[in-house]
Every structure is written in structure tokens, then in C-alpha cells.
């Protein structure tokens, strides 16, 4: 499917597409209030997996925090990190790997919040074919994309004994999967399984995060300069984003956000959006782990340390990397959005 997000799709953005969303009528913003204008770059086309940001715009949450937020939709031709480096955007959507890349490459950027506690990446196969666990996949061909080979694949190799000889090219469609009952392919829990179901298959899904893969996803990344010079603005943006995600995942007045998603990305429809939200809730993609007690966006030093060390041990990052420069806990873990 092409309706997904991720740095895994060669890094992102539709060329020059910038879509400013208008808050719903009735948002309680004094007419004389001066709003701080910010831009937020997503890493793929609009979809439910970006819903909390759209909710924060559509429901006037950013405006209540004194922010006018322009969501710039991603796509296959541009790279959010490069846009951040060039100073063309204020915040970007990213992941834990990119944050460690900043440190390795000496770039002055960092992660200030992690919306998804679980990376939505899955391997999926067909029900009833005898493949009932990751262990059962050892030695079998698996359709894997280029980015997956340098992110979750080393983890799977180390944990389950997978080998590079198992890799087959993944072309970002479910056609080969549908044609082979023994097929195993990568996907996102909220995307490819739905496409397979719509085509009449019965996919069985294995969430890599549930096997111990600790990558944070849908992170909020920003420049160190903005953190230093506009700390209050960063905090307000993070708080408003968390409130948007809390409302969106609970289904609270989400019609405006969903309409904006469908307007920005006509490939989206109500069924795809509903499925994505349902499975994200069921799997605890956003609300699980530390987020249950500290609020959506939660991050911890212990998890960052464990993630870095795991990726170091499989050769993804060098020993001695100052991984603590990749993130700041200053803006999260405040129980924002919790009842």
C-alpha cells in the first residue's frame, strides 16, 4: 500500500506540498491573541497514524496553546531531517533511529516526545499455514524493504537467528503476499493487514515491538537552537500535540480531523481510518508502557539506553556514542492528557 508513513519508504514528503489546516469554528482564542506560527513536517501522506496532529489543528487545541500550526504532509521525494537541517520547518515527525543518527553525525537536533510507544512494524503471514511465531519464520523467505534491513532486521537476526539469505525484495504492495500462502512480508499493523483482508486473505500479524524491539516511533524532533531559545513554545507544542492524540485515540469529536486527513490524502477513506485507530488501540501503539502512567509522548532514559545498546550490539551504531544527546525528557512525562 502507499498510504503509510515512515522513514522506511526512502524518506518522505511530497515536493513542496504544504497544507495549512484551519481550526474549527468556536475555538476559544481571543481575537487579539498573537499566535506563534510553526510548521510541522510529517514523514508520509496523511493518515490515521498522524491523526493526533490533525486533531490538535482541527479542534483548535494548538490555537488554545497560542500556536498556529501548519501541517506539511510527507511523501516519497523529500526527507524531513534534511528540511529541519535547512531550517525550512520547525518540527518534524521521526523515530528513534533518526535521533541517534543526529548524534552520530554531529547534528544539533533531538527528540522531545515519542507519540508511539510501540513501533507499528510487523511481519505478517497467512492464517493456518503453520507459521505461528517469529521462531517459525527462521529460514523462510521474508519480503523486506531497504530501510527495514538496517532497522528492525538486525534485531530479528540477533533475537531469532534470521539470516540475510532469507531476505526477498519488498515492493510495497500485497500482491506477492496474496499469491503465496506461505509468504511472509513486512508491513505496518495499521495498513498492510487491512489491504490483505480487503483482498480476501486472512493475515496473521506479528508485532515486532512485542518481541522486544524498542524503537520509538512518530517522534517530535526539533533543533537544539529552538529548545534553547523558545523553550516555552516547544513545551506548548508538545502539550497541545499530546492533547490532540489523547482526544483522537479516544474518538472524541474527530470528524474534523478525519475530514482533513481525507482532504489531504484522497487515498484515505473512513474504513481505513477506522481500522487503523482500532488496531492501534488494541495493540497499544500509542497508549501503553510508560504512556499509561506518564502520558502520551512519554520517554525514559532507561529505554533510550536499552535501545541504543541493542542497536550497538548488532553493529548499527558505534560503541561510545553519547546517545543521551539524542533526546530531552524535559517536555514529556507530565501526565498531560491523562484523566
What are the functions of these language-model segments?
Residues 1-7, 11, 15-25:
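N-terminal secretory signal peptides
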Residues 1-6, 31-33, 339:
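Basic/polar N-terminal segments that are highly enriched at the extreme N-terminus
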Residues 31-187, 206-207, 214:
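Short, glycine-/small- and polar/acidic-enriched structural segments
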Residues 70, 78-79, 210-211, 274-281, ...:
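Short linear loop/turn motifs
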Residues 97-98, 172-267:
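Pocket-lining segment of extracytoplasmic ligand-binding domains
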Residues 162-167, 265-278, 317-325:
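Short, surface-exposed acidic
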Residues 228-314:
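Secondary-structure end/capping motifs
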Residues 301-339:
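Conserved C-terminal helix/tail region of periplasmic/extracytoplasmic solute-binding proteins
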